[in-house]
């Protein structure tokens, strides 16, 4: 199933429609610290981030946007809570997109002022609903955060922005409860055609957060829901990008990146397959080319079981084989497996250039 969402422009990016899914992250620096924030944004860009959000929690942070913009090339999103005037200041200083939280931005009149300023500069707004900060009235109606509460909050503010003749809208409905988050996105995707920003909020540390994000975001992407995403981890933001890229890669939603498949090992394994798989992953981790490598621990069954891989190695004690698309190419010594694999792939890629 595919959703045909409308397209919203954020600086030079197009989000929605048939455009590729955009990967986002968020800085964890003091936004007023220009040097530290610029350094982190540029590090995020190096690993594949395409859009960066930064908290604008005071006047100094809002004023820093102008200087930060001079030193980075990625579009920037201002994360606004409580004080609508900070949104106005962020717009004045050249922000590319706003994220407002309906639960704490204030009165409709405040929202109108933000919308008018954003419209004048062609700046899109993400309505970022969060299960932890749903409006008091809606929370009282439902008794606790739930799917319907998230959707009602989002729909109210979508209609409010539309009333002010504003349609450059992106929507998110985040929760730390994966099931609630998935159901909320599915429901709103049937109600509006605005691009959806996917994410599990407060997902947790690297391991748990990766699992929760892969399940929540992945389930929606399989349904054809989602136009941009952020994996939230209690970790260096660079790790968020690595996980996000992997999610897109395994769902065949990315045009680049090497996918490594490897067997889980069993009693037939006679080499350090875990170490070998990690070596292969590290060697090809940064490659832009799109292909699949199999690392198998059994020379008898390995090539056949990994037939869908473009390239592969299978190893026994002291000896291994190289294979392509399940067909054995040659036998090599165990110690030369990685080097021979690199050589085979490198030669293939060079031939494709010609």
Swiss-Prot record:
GO terms for molecular function: 4 iron, 4 sulfur cluster binding; 4-hydroxy-3-methylbut-2-en-1-yl diphosphate synthase activity (ferredoxin); 4-hydroxy-3-methylbut-2-enyl-diphosphate synthase activity (flavodoxin); iron ion binding. One of its GO terms (biological process) is isopentenyl diphosphate biosynthetic process, methylerythritol 4-phosphate pathway. It comes from the Bacteria. Binds 1 [4Fe-4S] cluster. Its EC number is 1.17.7.3. Keywords: 4Fe-4S, Iron, Iron-sulfur, Isoprene biosynthesis, Metal-binding, Oxidoreductase. Transmembrane segments: none annotated. It is an enzyme of class 1 (oxidoreductase). Converts 2C-methyl-D-erythritol 2,4-cyclodiphosphate (ME-2,4cPP) into 1-hydroxy-2-methyl-2-(E)-butenyl 4-diphosphate. This is 4-hydroxy-3-methylbut-2-en-1-yl diphosphate synthase (flavodoxin). It comes from Fusobacterium nucleatum subsp. nucleatum (strain ATCC 25586 / DSM 15643 / BCRC 10681 / CIP 101130 / JCM 8532 / KCTC 2640 / LMG 13131 / VPI 4355). The lineage of its organism: Bacteria, Fusobacteriati, Fusobacteriota, Fusobacteriia, Fusobacteriales. The gene is ispG.
């Amino acid at each position: 199933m595919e959703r045909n969402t409308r397209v919203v422009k954020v600086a030079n990016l197009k989000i929605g429609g048939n455009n590729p899914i955009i990967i986002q992250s968020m800085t964890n620096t003091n936004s007023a610290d220009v040097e530290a924030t610029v350094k982190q944004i540029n590090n995020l860009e190096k690993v594949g981030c395409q859009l960066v959000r930064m908290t604008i929690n005071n006047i100094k942070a809002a004023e820093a946007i102008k200087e930060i913009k001079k030193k980075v090339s990625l579009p920037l999103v201002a994360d606004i809570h409580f004080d609508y005037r900070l949104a106005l200041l962020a717009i004045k200083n050249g922000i590319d997109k706003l994220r407002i939280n309906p639960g704490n931005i204030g009165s409709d009149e405040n929202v109108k002022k933000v919308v008018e300023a954003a419209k004048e500069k062609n700046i899109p707004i993400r309505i970022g609903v969060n299960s932890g900060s749903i409006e008091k009235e809606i929370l009282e109606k439902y008794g606790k955060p739930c799917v319907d509460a998230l959707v009602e909050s989002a729909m109210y503010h979508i209609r409010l922005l539309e009333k002010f003749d504003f349609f450059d809208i992106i929507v998110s409905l985040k929760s730390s409860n994966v099931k609630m988050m998935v159901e909320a996105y599915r429901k709103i995707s049937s109600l509006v055609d605005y691009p959806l920003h996917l994410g599990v909020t407060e997902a947790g540390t690297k391991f748990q957060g990766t699992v929760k994000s892969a399940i929540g975001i992945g389930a929606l992407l399989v349904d054809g829901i989602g136009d941009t995403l952020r994996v939230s981890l209690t970790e260096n933001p660079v790790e968020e990008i690595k996980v996000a890229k992997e999610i897109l890669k395994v769902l065949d939603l990315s045009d680049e990146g090497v996918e490594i498949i490897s067997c889980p090992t069993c009693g037939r394994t006679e080499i350090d397959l875990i170490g070998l798989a990690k070596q292969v992953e590290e060697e090809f981790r940064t490659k832009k080319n799109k292909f699949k490598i199999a690392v198998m621990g059994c020379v008898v069954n390995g090539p056949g079981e990994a037939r869908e891989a473009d390239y592969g190695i299978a190893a026994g004690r002291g000896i291994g084989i190289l294979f392509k698309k399940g067909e054995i190419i040659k036998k090599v010594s165990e110690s030369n497996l990685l080097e021979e694999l690199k050589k085979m792939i490198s030669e293939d890629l060079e031939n494709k250039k010609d």
